Amino acid sequence: MIPVTSFKGRKVALFGLGGSGLATAQALVSGGADVVAWDDNPDSVAKAAAAGIATADLRGADWHAFAAFVLSPGVPLTHPKPHWSVDLAHQAGVEIIGDVELFVRERRKHAPDCPFIAITGTNGKSTTTALIAHILRTSGRDTQLGGNIGTAVLTLDPPKAGRFYVVECSSYQIDLAPTLDPTAGILLNLTPDHLDRHGTMQHYADIKERLVAGSGTAVVGVDDSLSSLIADRVERAGTKVVRISRRHPLAEGIYAEGSALMRAQDGASSLFTDLAGIQTLRGGHNAQNAAAAIAACLAVGISGKDIVDGLRSFPGLKHRMQPVAKKGEVVFVNDSKATNAEAAAPALSSYDRIYWIAGGLPKEGGITSLAPFFPKIVKAYLIGEAAPSFAATLGEAVPYEISGTLEKAVAHAAADAARDSQGPAAVMLSPACASFDQYKNFEVRGDAFVGHVAALEGVSMLI
C-alpha cells in the first residue's frame, strides 16, 4: 500500500467504496488523514465500516471542514449530470480529486525521479500497459503495475528511487488528476466511447489530452485526426513528442510496415524489430501497442535489446485476441474485451475465415464500421440485445443466425467450422458490445466462452 501522507491530520471526504474506493480510503487513513466515507450502496458502506473506515452520509456533513473530496472514478463528475456529492463539494469550494492524483502527489513528495509511465486511449490500453510492465520486469527493473488495468494504484508498493510505475488511466481517472505528470505519457488513439459520461467527443478528447500534456515525453498515436491534433498542440507547448503509427511512415517516431516496426530519427529510418511469429502481438493494432511500448521504454532508459527480448516473450492478456483452443484447423479465439466495433476490428482483420460470435449490449454506431471485414466472415452468430440490430446491418452481406445465448453460439459455430474444408478457420468471440445485458463484465463473458469451448468434444486447450 502507498500511505497517502499529503492530507495527514486533515479531514477528507470520500465517495465511492466499490472497486478502488475502499483501497483509497485505507491508503488515506494509513497516511494519517481523517477520512469520512460514503456510498449509495449500503453493502459497500457496511464493508468499509467493517474494515475500520469511518462512514457517514455526506449529505449531512460540514463540507467546509474538508481539505479535499476524493471521488471514485465510477461516479459521474460532469455527465450525464454531476453526482449529488460533486454538487456539495463545488458549493463548498472543496477540490475534487481521485486515486491517481493521490498517487501522483505521493510520488512527487517522496521519489519524484522514479520513472512513471501512464497509458490512455480508447482501445489498446491494457495490452500496452501489460506489455510495458513485462518489458521492464524482464529487463530486471523493480516494476509496479496498476490503475485501470485492475489493481488499484494505491495498493502498489510505495515510491522509492529506482522503482518503475506503469499505470493505465481511464478518462474518468484523468479527469480527477489535475496535476498528472508522468515521465512518459501515452495516448494510443481516440474513438467515440463513454460519451454518456463526457457529453461530447471534444470533451472526451480534452480529458485524454491532459495525460500527455503533463508528460516529460508524450507518446501519441497519430492515426486518428483528434490524436494527431493533440500531438501537434502538445509539441507546440514545448513537450517532447514521439509519434507512433500503424498505418503510414513517419519522418520522426516509430511506425509499422506490416509486422516490421521502424524507428525514424534524424532523417533516417531503420528496422527496430519484427513482430512476425509473436502470436500474442498479432495484428495491426498490436503493432501500434508495441510501437507505444518501445517509445515509452526508450524514454525511460531501457535498451533496444531488452525491449526486443521483452516483446518476444510477452505472454499476452486474457480476453484480448487470446487463442484458447484448437481442433484440427480451427482455432478458438477469446476477444471478449472488444466491447465496441473499433475494438473488434483488429481481431476481424487478423484471420481470413471467421465464424464470428457477436452481440451484447450495443454501443453507439453498432457494427457499420466493420463492413470492410464482412468478406472474411463465413457466418455470424448473434447474441444478446444487439442481435436484431446487428442482423439488420449484416443483411444479405453475411450469413447469420440469431443464437441468443453464448452457449448456443459456440456450439453452432464450432459445428459449422468443423465442416469447413477451405483451410484454417477461427471461431471468434469478438462481441463489439458491452456485456452487461447477459454478464457482469467482459471477463465473465470471456471465461464463459472458454468454458463452453472446453466442453466441446475433441478440442485441445491452449491455456
UniProtKB/Swiss-Prot annotation:
ATP binds at residues 121-127. The keyword Cytoplasm applies. It is found in: Cytoplasm. GO terms for molecular function: ATP binding; tetrahydrofolylpolyglutamate synthase activity; UDP-N-acetylmuramoylalanine-D-glutamate ligase activity. This is UDP-N-acetylmuramoylalanine--D-glutamate ligase. Pathway: Cell wall biogenesis; peptidoglycan biosynthesis. GO terms for biological process: cell division; cell wall organization; peptidoglycan biosynthetic process; regulation of cell shape. Pfam families: Mur_ligase_C, Mur_ligase_M. The keyword Cell cycle applies. Gene3D superfamilies: Mur ligase, C-terminal domain (3.90.190.20), Mur-like, catalytic domain (3.40.1190.10), NAD(P)-binding Rossmann-like Domain (3.40.50.720). Its main location: cytoplasm. Cell wall formation. Catalyzes the addition of glutamate to the nucleotide precursor UDP-N-acetylmuramoyl-L-alanine (UMA). Belongs to the MurCDEF family. Its EC number is 6.3.2.9. SUPFAM superfamilies: MurCD N-terminal domain, MurD-like peptide ligases, catalytic domain, MurD-like peptide ligases, peptide-binding domain. One of its GO terms (cellular component) is cytoplasm. InterPro entries: Folylpolyglutamate_synth_CS, Mur-like_cat_sf, Mur_ligase_C, Mur_ligase_C_dom_sf, Mur_ligase_cen, MurD. It is an enzyme of class 6 (ligase). It catalyses: UDP-N-acetyl-alpha-D-muramoyl-L-alanine + D-glutamate + ATP = UDP-N-acetyl-alpha-D-muramoyl-L-alanyl-D-glutamate + ADP + phosphate + H(+). Keywords: ATP-binding, Cell cycle, Cell division, Cell shape, Cell wall biogenesis/degradation, Cytoplasm, Ligase, Nucleotide-binding, Peptidoglycan synthesis. It comes from Rhizobium meliloti (strain 1021).
